[in-house]
Amino acid sequence: LDLSLDIIEAVLSDKSLNGWDGFGVVVQAYGKRALYVIDWLHAIAKKYNRKIMVRLVKGAYWDTEIKRAQIEGLGNFPVYTRKDLTDCSYIYCAEKLLNLSDRIYPQFATHNANSVAMILELSDKKTPFEFQRLHGMGEVLHRLILERENVSCRIYAPVGPHRDLLAYLVRRLLENGANSSFVNQLIDTSLSASEIADDVFITSKIDSNKKTKLLKPSDLFLPDRINSRGWDLHDMNDISEINSSRNVFKNHEWNIGPEIISEVTGIEKIIIRNPANYEDIVGSVIYANEKDTINSIN
């Protein structure tokens, strides 16, 4: 994420973009940093006098994020582990985008009627924004938006060769075909209309009292053992902790030699340098000669 933000700032700072409002960014609401990313985007747009488009989505790489956190033994997951919390995050992010419309043009990508209704309620009818849907999905909902609310709707249609589109289409199929997805719930005859239309802010509080089935990455192998701890090098808090531990030895030189009873006779001291920064002298080492070896054995 930090690398992406650095690239985005570098592009927005380019003076050749002066007067152009076509730059767009996607924010994924399932990320726990989503609200902070929106604040950052607004600050950068203001800094360089830009107007940018921000497309808000729920997020399409949940499985990958969860698996990576487990493999790397991170302290916690970077994304919400429950769908209802992601739905709540989406609305909070939507409200923030609407309130920052002086520098941001909000684009809400959703097929969820609950999300649409809440966004329409939050909007002041004066702030320009749009809804978005995938080609072939959410057609009825977005047609109603156009007819009743007179709000712009954009169709997101991927274009390209089969080998490039297949992976993308499979991800969309898995995302929208999940049992918990709004689109899938609509055709589930076992669910009543009231269940589908439940307020996510109420259901999330109810579900928070239930024990989650998804263990933290550190608890993945319990009760047998604790998962080996990893470090998220994209997390500034983790990097800060690593640097704090390293700073204790910042000016320390490691000088070593053979550990034998008698005095070391080898006099050649080899300077050891940091291979990543050759000017950084880590320390020195004195290698044992033949006499030192004999003394050690004796």
Walk through the language-model features, giving the residues of each.
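Active-site capping/gating regions of soluble enzymes
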Residues: 4-186, 195
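Terminal low-complexity tails and localization/encapsulation signals of metabolic enzymes
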Residues: 159-160, 164-167, 171-298
